[in-house]
């Protein structure tokens, strides 16, 4: 089995019991809801990645944020007929302030590299099967429980 590492920065954009999630396309989380964010590029800090990815995926300019968690999960998936195990490592930030109206920016359902767009979801209405492993872990760390 091929073993890979993925290092990323992700945003927790909350409004009461609602959280912004993206609908993933491709990869081990295909069809799942995931936190907006992505890969830390060569030379980038985790914070620079956070700002870039949230502008790309959600359409917001991050103004104020705080580190919430650093965590990892292992995900195994079938990639082109070969099993791959990915050690998914992330920095997770609570977004406290941003520019642009998130609702108008995420209403566009355009397909980019790895998502079908983003929107607010009521956390209490989500099922754990809908979520990526890493999103589930972080939402539970916020104090929410799933059956």
Model-inferred region functions:
Residues 40-63, 74-131:
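Unchanged
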Residues 1-20, 89-94:
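Conserved N-terminal beta-strand and adjoining loop/helix that marks the start
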Residues 3, 29-30, 73-77:
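Short, solvent-exposed loop/turn segments at secondary-structure junctions
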Residues 1-4, 112, 131-136:
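A beta-strand edge to alpha-helix "cap/lid" segment located at domain peripheries
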Residues 129-147:
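Charged phosphate-binding loop/patch that engages nucleotide di/tri-phosphates or the phosphate backbone
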Residues 12, 18-21, 25-33:
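N-terminal first-folded block
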Residues 31-35, 116-117:
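A short, polar/proline- and glycine-enriched secondary-structure boundary/capping micro-motif
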């Amino acid at each position: 089995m091929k073993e890979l590492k993925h290092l990323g920065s992700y945003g927790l954009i909350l409004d009461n019991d609602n959280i912004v999630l993206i609908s993933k396309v491709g990869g081990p989380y295909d069809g799942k809801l995931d936190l907006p964010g992505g890969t830390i590029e060569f030379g980038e800090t985790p914070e620079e990645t956070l700002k870039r990815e949230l502008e790309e995926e959600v359409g917001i300019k991050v103004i104020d944020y705080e580190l919430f968690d650093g965590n990892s999960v292992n995900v195994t998936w079938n990639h082109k007929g070969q099993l791959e195990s990915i050690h998914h490592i992330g920095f997770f930030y609570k977004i406290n302030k941003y520019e642009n109206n998130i609702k108008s920016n995420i209403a566009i359902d355009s397909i980019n590299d790895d998502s079908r767009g983003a929107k607010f979801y009521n956390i209490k209405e989500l099922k754990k099967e809908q979520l990526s492993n890493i999103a589930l872990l972080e939402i539970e760390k916020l104090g929410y429980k799933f059956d």
